[in-house]
Amino acid sequence: MPKMKTHRGAAKRFKKTKTGLLKRMKAYKSHILTKKSSKRKRNLRKATVVSKGDFKRIKQLLP
C-alpha cells in the first residue's frame, strides 16, 4: 500500500498539540472589522481546540 498523503490545506490550518488534540485559529478575523468591537477582535486572535465532532474527520486528513 502506498504512503498516505497529507491534506496540505488541513496541514496549514491545524496543529497537533502534545496531548494529541488539534489546535485551530478562529474565523471572522480577515475583513469587515470596523463594526466588530475591540473585545471581540481580541478574542478572535486566540487559538482554540477542534470540537469532538470534527476531530475524527480532520484526523484522517493528517496521517
Curated annotation (Swiss-Prot):
Cysteine pairings via disulfide bonds: none
Stored InterPro entries: Ribosomal_bL35, Ribosomal_bL35-like, Ribosomal_bL35_CS, Ribosomal_bL35_sf
Keyword field contains Nucleus: no
Listed GO biological process terms: translation
Molecular functions (GO terms): structural constituent of ribosome
Coiled coil: none
Pfam families with a match to the protein in the record: Ribosomal_L35p (PF01632)
GO cellular component, one term: cytosolic large ribosomal subunit
Entry keywords, A to Z: Ribonucleoprotein, Ribosomal protein
NCBIfam families, per the entry: rpmI_bact (TIGR00001)
Similarity comment: Belongs to the bacterial ribosomal protein bL35 family.
PANTHER family named in the record: 54S RIBOSOMAL PROTEIN BL35M, LARGE RIBOSOMAL SUBUNIT PROTEIN BL35M
Official protein name in the record: Large ribosomal subunit protein bL35
Provenance organism: Alkaliphilus metalliredigens (strain QYMF)
